[in-house]
């Protein structure tokens, strides 16, 4: 029996990144031998065991052969005669096909070290094409390591295109697509994930609502980048700088979906694109089974981001109604989330990356004023039932009006 550290732990250590999880491969052993040594078996489809002390995963060396369509139909073979090189060959990228023995020596049969040094994401073998999930994984790795200068090897991108055009991605379940997307949204450059999907044709298959935005023009006066698809990726990049929250980043990604519905004869203007985009947000989220909380914020951002841009023009009643519409009284975090997504929208434009966004400050200030109106005082004044809400709203509007006159007067 020989044990090797494999995969991501070696890759990240060589890149100087924190190592979160360590995975091990066991060569020349059997399930019974692992159980006799005190390991606990956890894998159903192939032999994976937990170490009795560290609880890290130890997998018997195995090979995989595609036996059907999609990414789940694989026949696994795990036996003592499977070599380390055999096991590493089934992995997706060369930088993940590295192993390290107990002396610290790195085994690199597929030039993963060279690709790591050259910042290349390259597939190990043609077997890459048997698993459509790998298209998403490579896009996610591209986003994760973009800040280090990584790019996808030409031959790998070509293979990803071939897989997409062959219809392989249609076998992916919504849950897996969302899981990879959610992981990509946590990276430093989530926009790279969607750009890679577009480069290989997968965006049109998995995110047609986003793909439809490319080639749709917006007024050059407000959008020097012109193309709404490019603007969408720029806003996502900006959102990633402003917030680590997946729901903020996803909502920003979806904020302009309604522009994809504008008839070409009305271009480059997109009146009413916000409310129009709400149905597309719901459609996308239902298809990918996006969690409700993330979906709900995306709907609100699509509907109200343009309203927040015009904040100085809003009367106090409209401002308080906005807080009602986003359910801010029960979910106050939505005010901050709307401020951040709207700021990302404004700064996600060519030449506006460092722009100030006072509307965000005014939104936050107006919220502090509105929520500081005490409910207790209304009740103590003798109001009852529905009168309480009506009087509370009236007082909130009055408080916001007083604040607005001093801090955010309506332009002449």
Curated annotation (Swiss-Prot):
PROSITE patterns: HD (PS51831)
Keyword Transit peptide on entry: no
Keywords: ATP-binding, Hydrolase, Magnesium, Metal-binding, Multifunctional enzyme, Nickel, Nucleotide-binding, Nucleotidyltransferase, RNA repair, RNA-binding, Transferase, tRNA processing
Keyword ATP-binding attributed: yes
Domain HD: 228-329
Residues noted as binding CTP in the record, renumbered to the chain: 8, 11, 91, 137, 140
Superkingdom of the organism of origin: Bacteria
Residues involved in ATP binding: 8, 11, 91, 137, 140
Reactions that this protein is recorded to catalyse: a tRNA precursor + 2 CTP + ATP = a tRNA with a 3' CCA end + 3 diphosphate; a tRNA with a 3' CCA end + 2 CTP + ATP = a tRNA with a 3' CCACCA end + 3 diphosphate
PANTHER family per the UniProt record, alphabetical: MULTIFUNCTIONAL CCA PROTEIN
Family: Belongs to the tRNA nucleotidyltransferase/poly(A) polymerase family. Bacterial CCA-adding enzyme type 1 subfamily.
Entry remark concerning the domains of this protein: Comprises two domains: an N-terminal domain containing the nucleotidyltransferase activity and a C-terminal HD domain associated with both phosphodiesterase and phosphatase activities.
Role: Catalyzes the addition and repair of the essential 3'-terminal CCA sequence in tRNAs without using a nucleic acid template. Adds these three nucleotides in the order of C, C, and A to the tRNA nucleotide-73, using CTP and ATP as substrates and producing inorganic pyrophosphate. tRNA 3'-terminal CCA addition is required both for tRNA processing and repair. Also involved in tRNA surveillance by mediating tandem CCA addition to generate a CCACCA at the 3' terminus of unstable tRNAs. While stable tRNAs receive only 3'-terminal CCA, unstable tRNAs are marked with CCACCA and rapidly degraded.
This protein's name: Multifunctional CCA protein
Provenance organism: Shigella sonnei (strain Ss046)
């Amino acid at each position: 029996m020989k044990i090797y550290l494999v995969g991501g732990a070696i890759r990240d250590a060589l890149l100087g990144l924190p190592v979160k999880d360590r995975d091990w491969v066991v060569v020349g052993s059997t399930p019974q031998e692992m159980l006799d040594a005190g390991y606990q078996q956890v894998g159903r489809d192939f032999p994976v065991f937990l170490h009795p002390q560290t609880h890290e995963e130890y997998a018997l060396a195995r090979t995989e052969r595609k036996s059907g369509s999609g990414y789940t139909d694989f026949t696994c073979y795990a036996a003592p005669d499977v070599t380390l090189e055999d096991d590493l060959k089934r992995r997706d990228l060369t930088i993940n096909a590295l192993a390290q023995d107990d002396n610290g020596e790195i085994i690199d049969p597929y030039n993963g070290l060279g690709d790591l040094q050259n910042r290349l994401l390259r597939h190990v073998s043609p077997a890459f094409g048997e698993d459509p999930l790998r298209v998403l994984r490579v896009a996610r790795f591209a986003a994760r390591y973009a800040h280090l200068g990584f790019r996808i090897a030409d031959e790998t991108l070509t293979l990803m295109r071939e897989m997409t055009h062959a219809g392989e991605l249609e076998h992916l379940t919504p849950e897996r697509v969302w899981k990879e997307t959610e992981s990509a949204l946590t990276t430093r450059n989530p926009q790279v994930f969607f750009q890679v999907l577009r480069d290989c044709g997968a965006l049109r298959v998995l995110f047609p609502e986003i793909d439809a935005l490319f080639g749709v023009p917006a007024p050059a006066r407000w959008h020097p980048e012109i193309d709404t698809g490019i603007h969408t990726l720029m806003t996502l990049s900006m959102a990633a700088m402003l917030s680590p929250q997946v729901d903020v980043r996803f909502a920003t990604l979806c904020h302009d979906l309604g522009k994809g519905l504008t008839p070409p004869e009305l271009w480059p203007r997109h009146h009413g694109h916000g409310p129009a985009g709400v149905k597309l947000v719901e459609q996308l989220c239902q298809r990918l089974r996006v969690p409700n909380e993330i979906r709900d914020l995306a709907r609100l951002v699509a509907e109200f981001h343009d309203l927040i841009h015009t904040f100085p023009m809003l009367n106090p009643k409209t401002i308080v109604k906005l807080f009602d519409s986003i359910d801010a009284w029960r979910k106050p975090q939505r005010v901050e989330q709307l401020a951040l997504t709207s700021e990302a929208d404004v700064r996600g434009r060519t030449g506006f990356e460092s722009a100030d966004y006072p509307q965000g400050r005014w939104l936050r200030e107006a919220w502090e004023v509105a929520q500081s109106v005490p409910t207790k005082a209304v009740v103590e004044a003798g109001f009852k039932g529905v009168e309480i809400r009506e009087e509370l709203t009236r007082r909130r509007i009055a408080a916001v009006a007083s604040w607005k006159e001093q801090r955010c007067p309506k332009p002449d």
